[in-house]
UniProtKB/Swiss-Prot annotation:
Keywords: Amino-acid biosynthesis, Aromatic amino acid biosynthesis, Cobalt, Cytoplasm, Lyase, Metal-binding, NAD, Nucleotide-binding, Zinc. Its EC number is 4.2.3.4. It is an enzyme of class 4 (lyase). The keyword Amino-acid biosynthesis applies. It comes from Bacillus cereus (strain ZK / E33L). Zn(2+) binds at E184, H247, H264. This is 3-dehydroquinate synthase.
Length: 361
């Protein structure tokens, strides 16, 4: 098992990674001061049916424990479910000393975290991720819900008390979710750990390799990349934006295709390829785009759909949180491990995106 210490200006906490990590949950709760009054577990239907009772049983503590379960899917990260969770919290008499446990993937972590951030102006919560993708979202304190006009547009910064990454929970994931989460692993390697990038190319030949000791190795290497960036910039005023590598186009694809019709990781994978494609032009460097494209396709990442309107995607990219005064800002790569936020004119993005779309076919 590997423990990772997270340090930010507002809070310090640990990420417990391994096959026995759930055994830490009771101790974490018992050691909290002031003492936890009661516990609300927020999960989704798919995860709850598999793991909710396991977590309840692991909480060997004399406190009221109740659950709030929403349907599965990114579209459920909505104001309606956010409001309903608050109603459930009030009906079950949560107070300022209560604890919320986020049991699920990134959608649940974001929703539950935002409920914790806003209920009575902020109560404590613990992340219990059940997907590979959540190795990114569970760490760093960004919590949010979606708006019909944009992803993660309503939210806060609210750090968890701990992250309990019990790797056996991941074994029930379908392949598309392994692929989705692996995209964020690749992102962390490309922007912050070149040695990990080369290790992935050598040691992860198929998604089936993302198991057991290799999985723990990946998590204990990828999470510190994010931790180091968050330690420098907790509230995304500077270098934390580097973690959005691949996300400008990725989020636009999610919005255009409809949440649930493309996974977050698949969108980010296409977005990273485009960022590398554009970076070669902007920086006049060779980043081995063709080799990278073949590597991504080997894992089953999608190509950019040929029937999507480039103009529509450009307009959606202008709604990205990094955009400033209607100008697209993208995270581009100077070299492996070195990225920057760059202002890109609409016309440049449009021309590059058209060329990229054609190159995919």
């Amino acid at each position: 098992m590997g423990n990772i210490h997270i340090q930010t200006k507002s809070k310090e906490y640990d990420v417990y990674v391994g096959k026995e990590s759930l055994s830490h949950l009771t101790t974490i709760v018992q050691n909290m001061q002031p003492s936890v009054s009661n516990i609300m577990i927020i999960s989704d239907e798919a995860v709850a049916s598999l793991h909710l009772q396991t977590v309840v049983d692991a909480l060997q503590i004399d406190r009221k424990v109740f659950s709030f379960v929403v349907p599965s899917g990114e579209k459920e990260k909505s104001f309606e479910n956010f409001y309903a969770a608050h109603t459930s919290a009030l009906e079950n008499k949560l107070d300022r000393n209560s604890l919320i446990v986020a049991l699920g993937g990134g959608m649940i972590g974001d929703l539950a975290g935002f409920v914790a951030a806003s209920f009575m102006r902020g109560i404590r919560f613990v992340q219990v991720p059940t997907t590979l993708l959540a190795h990114d979202s569970a760490v760093g304190g960004k919590v949010a819900i979606n708006h019909p006009l944009g992803k993660n547009m309503i939210g806060a910064f609210h750090q968890p008390e701990a992250v309990v990454y019990h790797t056996p929970f991941l074994q029930s994931l379908p392949e598309k979710e392994w692929r989705s989460g692996y995209a964020e692993v690749i992102k962390h390697a490309l922007i912050g750990d070149v040695k990990l990038y080369h290790w992935l190319k050598e040691d992860v030949q198929t998604l089936a390799d993302l198991r057991d000791e290799k999985l723990i190795h990946i998590l204990t290497k990828a999470i510190p990349v994010k931790a180091n960036i968050v330690a420098q910039d907790e509230t995304e005023k500077g270098v934390r934006a580097h973690l959005n590598f691949g996300h400008t186009l990725g989020h636009a694809l999610e919005k255009e295709l409809g949440y649930g019709n493309i996974t977050h990781g698949d969108g980010v994978a296409v977005g990273m390829l485009f960022a590398i494609f554009l970076s070669e032009q902007v920086y006049k460097v060779n980043l081995a785009y063709e080799e990278m494209k073949q590597w991504f396709l080997k894992y089953g990442y999608p190509k950019m759909p040929s029937d999507l309107s480039v103009e529509r995607l450009v307009q959606l990219m202008k709604q990205d949180k990094k955009a400033n005064a209607g100008t697209i800002h993208m995270v581009l790569m100077q070299e492996y491990g070195v990225v920057n936020v760059v202002s890109i004119p609409d016309e440049t993005v449009h021309i590059a995106l058209e060329a990229f779309q054609k190159d995919m076919f």
